[in-house]
Design a protein with these regions (language model features):
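Negatively charged
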Residues: 1-186
Length: 186
């Protein structure tokens, strides 16, 4: 998986009529407990278990899922890998409805510099207690409506480094974040 050109993640917006699958797979969003963005694939992952999630369908971004059983329930850890930073074109509803998601690592592998819409990006991530969004570039974002809507287990959230100079819509951005005790906007 050696690519020198830009690696753009496919659009993955949830359906409005019901539960959606993850990035073109048959796995439901509600079955994901962890998302890890990374640069390399472990050796134990074979080609048959990976699928292409790049917008160009050029295998510049690959994903695979590892089965985990929690309380006898089949769930998955999702891994997304690329040799370069993964560029987002649009983040609207990107993680919407991942209701069992407990951990997501956005870290250094995401390039959101050209994203203008982050509305409902983490909407309905009920199980997520903490989230590090310090790596998100929000300098071109105009819409943050409902970005953290219904993230009911967040206790603290630091968005102090968000560049909101172009944002025109923040409606319901933190609605139903019922456990939120500390919100850093400074």
């Amino acid at each position: 998986m050696v690519h020198t050109k830009e690696a753009v993640l496919m659009l993955d917006t949830p359906s409005e009529s019901g539960e959606s699958c993850v990035l073109g797979s048959t796995i439901l969003r509600s079955q994901i407990v962890r998302i890890q963005f990374c640069s390399k694939m472990p050796l134990e992952v074979c080609q048959g278990e990976m699928w292409d999630v790049s917008a160009a369908h050029d295998r510049s971004i690959l994903a695979w899922a590892k089965k985990v059983f929690i309380s006898s329930k089949l769930l998955y850890e999702l891994y997304i890998a690329s040799d370069t930073k993964i560029k987002l074109q649009n983040a609207r509803g990107l993680f919407w409805g991942y209701e069992n998601l407990c951990e997501i690592n956005l870290d250094k592998w995401i390039d959101s510099s050209s994203v203008s819409d982050m509305s409902y990006m983490f909407c309905g991530c009920h199980s997520l207690k903490k989230l590090d969004v310090s790596g998100l570039d929000t300098s071109n974002v105009v819409n943050m409506e409902g970005m953290f809507y219904w993230c009911s287990k967040f206790q603290t959230l630091d968005v102090s480094y968000f560049d909101t100079s172009h944002v025109i819509n923040m409606k319901s951005m933190f609605d139903y974040c019922s456990s939120l005790k500390k919100l850093d906007l400074s």
